[in-house]
């Protein structure tokens, strides 16, 4: 598996040049969109990328604690604890966080998608959403393996409780839905309660 940080660092990131009274300023495209309060989760959820997203959330809250943040998600999931650090920060800050799935939101990606501001959780028409229980592997002494198995069970219960909170489904329904890889269309995810709307086009701005 390629290191996601190497992939990002070696990628050709478009630059945006702006003119001002002080001359030209160049921004990479993600920094420019951050000025518009747009942040991204692209690729696997892991510690370094999660810390960048947490930092962006905290920065935008410090700039304006009442203004909406748009969080675009295209992720196959990844490390549970990394995802939970993003989740907890989304719940912690005062800004409402709108979530939008483009491409896919699987595993921890789906949890972050459904954790957005109620009424403001969206997916594009061809997005795919997948939920399942956490998985992990461990080698070592039998006692340590049992300890890790209990930890995975505890994480499974906690993740189920988070889905219950944000979907409005009862615990047994969530438990059953997450027992195996459960792929959904955007419409099915809306019916299940993971998102609020499937959107094809950006809404027109309200008339002044």
Curated annotation (Swiss-Prot):
Biological processes per GO annotation: protein quality control for misfolded or incompletely synthesized proteins
Keywords: Cytoplasm, Hydrolase, Protease, Serine protease
UniProt keyword Hydrolase present: yes
Location, primary (coarse class): cytoplasm
InterPro entries linked to this entry: ClpP (IPR001907), ClpP/crotonase-like_dom_sf (IPR029045), ClpP/TepA (IPR023562), ClpP_His_AS (IPR033135), ClpP_Ser_AS (IPR018215)
The reaction(s) this protein catalyses: Hydrolysis of proteins to small peptides in the presence of ATP and magnesium. alpha-casein is the usual test substrate. In the absence of ATP, only oligopeptides shorter than five residues are hydrolyzed (such as succinyl-Leu-Tyr-|-NHMec, and Leu-Tyr-Leu-|-Tyr-Trp, in which cleavage of the -Tyr-|-Leu- and -Tyr-|-Trp bonds also occurs)
Task of the protein: Cleaves peptides in various proteins in a process that requires ATP hydrolysis. Has a chymotrypsin-like activity. Plays a major role in the degradation of misfolded proteins.
Stated family: Belongs to the peptidase S14 family.
Protein's name in the database: ATP-dependent Clp protease proteolytic subunit
Species this chain originates from: Methylobacterium radiotolerans (strain ATCC 27329 / DSM 1819 / JCM 2831 / NBRC 15690 / NCIMB 10815 / 0-1)
Gene: clpP
